Amino acid sequence: MMAPYYIKEYLTRPALLRRLGVSIVVLFFSSMLKAQSDTYFALPPLYEWQGGQHTIDLQFSASSSTSNVWIYNSDTSYSQNLVVTPGALVTTSLTNVIGGLSSTYGARELTWSNSKRYKDALFIEASQPVTVTERVKHQFNQDIITGKGTNGIGTDFYVASQTLILSTVTGSYTSYYGKHYVSIVALEDSTEVLIKARPGNVFDNGSDSVAFILDQGQSWVSTMADDDVLLGTRVTSSKPIAVTAGGNHLKNSSGNPGDGGIDQVTPVEHLGLKHVVLRGRSTYPQDYFMYIATEDNTNITVDGVSVLTNGSKGASGTYSLPGNANPGKPYVVESNEPIYVFQVTTGVANGSPEQGMAQLPHIDCTGSTF
């Protein structure tokens, strides 16, 4: 049985759920790495792109105090203890395909979408705050997912996946499969969950919505139909959940690579009004960000120029950063209501970039350091 300690405790400590802080500064100042630090993490399973191939590294760091860390899966059939000291990077690898899972712990096997599972989600408890990343290791489709801690727990989320893509590949293409997916883990019994796609998009069940009930520790993965993206999809629940979403091996519109862009998503309550997007190395239009409005009458500007006026709740769009690649050039995104901003970019300066995706934190100051 999964340990309930932090699952119950965080509900009685609302201050923990307001610790997003000024986490954008991690892009600039290593001393501010505490922005993603926490003592509890719930990590929904990462959907595989090739059967049995999701080798996952979990990496831990601590900024100030030595931390005793416990990693376990939903039923504690996987359990490991680590000690993380300040200044050290501690890595544990999940490499073995587990009987009954057909994948490593922390991953979801290709054939088990739209089904409840009880062993593939991961949980982390720490005696002192730590920073956690999941690293998908393979010669292709590598990715890094930042654990959001208690800031990643809530009941109302919007998610995204790359939008400027050539196609979603459901058949075998050089031994991989491309999918837009959303992955969820419940923290309490009898949690009712609804995933609702934006108008015009459907899931692989042929419907624009998926509804199910999960017990504590159970997880669920839903995928979109061919060429339908996640941008603007809403996830709501009756009790707190954690959500990871994005795309596996999606072919970008200017080349052949099939790339992964996945992130753990923060709930609506942790969003803000101001974001900074830093230009990557991709050529136009492949360096872009996506936005989602969470309230009616939302206005959004980029460097003072309007990109959305009086947008309705759930309105979403894609904005390509103009001009030639200028790595590091900042673009200021401001809104009058809280919004999501997801960036898609690359470190490759050519027309066939390897594109990742991540949710950008807002830079509004909340008065906290975590």
Please identify what each model-predicted range represents:
Residues 1-38:
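Bacterial Sec-dependent N-terminal signal peptides
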Residues 36-370:
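Intrinsically disordered, low-complexity linker/terminal regions across diverse proteins
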